[in-house]
């Protein structure tokens, strides 16, 4: 492991942020810190993860939602101080790593199947 990777690992450990396991196709709720004037509040952004970029400290993901009939995409830095929390609502079953094709789709054709999690038998 080179020096830059080591520094990034130390910085991630110092931040102490726990990011849940999620993948493209999952529906997530991202709580974002929004500053309005002198007060700060949390704003929820719920949508489907259409892309995920795993680059250590520079990891990011794109969330897409439909807001009043208009598609809205927002890119979040995973370790940003503006991201308060990430919660996985629903697991999606997709076969692609990047779901950019959802941009051209609307309505029922943009739906994503739910991933069924198998229960492990206790032996």
Curated annotation (Swiss-Prot):
Keywords: Ribonucleoprotein, Ribosomal protein. One of its GO terms (cellular component) is cytosolic large ribosomal subunit. It comes from the Bacteria. InterPro entries: Ribosomal_bL19, Ribosomal_bL19_CS, Ribosomal_bL19_sf, Translation_prot_SH3-like_sf. GO terms for molecular function: structural constituent of ribosome. The keyword Ribonucleoprotein applies. GO terms for biological process: translation. Signal peptide: none annotated. Belongs to the bacterial ribosomal protein bL19 family. PANTHER family: LARGE RIBOSOMAL SUBUNIT PROTEIN BL19M, RIBOSOMAL PROTEIN L19. HAMAP family: Ribosomal_bL19 (MF_00402). This protein is located at the 30S-50S ribosomal subunit interface and may play a role in the structure and function of the aminoacyl-tRNA binding site. This is Large ribosomal subunit protein bL19.
């Amino acid at each position: 492991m080179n020096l830059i990777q080591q520094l990034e690992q130390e910085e991630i450990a110092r931040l102490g942020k726990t990011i849940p396991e999620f993948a493209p196709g999952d529906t997530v709720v991202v709580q974002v810190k929004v500053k309005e004037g002198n007060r700060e509040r949390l704003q929820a952004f719920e949508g489907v993860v259409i892309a995920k970029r795993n680059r250590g400290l520079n990891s990011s993901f794109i969330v897409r939602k439909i807001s009043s009939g208009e598609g809205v995409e927002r890119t979040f830095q995973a370790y940003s101080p503006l991201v308060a929390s990430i919660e996985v609502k629903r697991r999606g079953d997709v076969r692609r790593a990047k779901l950019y094709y959802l941009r051209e789709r609307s309505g029922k054709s943009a739906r994503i199947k739910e991933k069924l999690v198998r229960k492990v038998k206790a032996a």
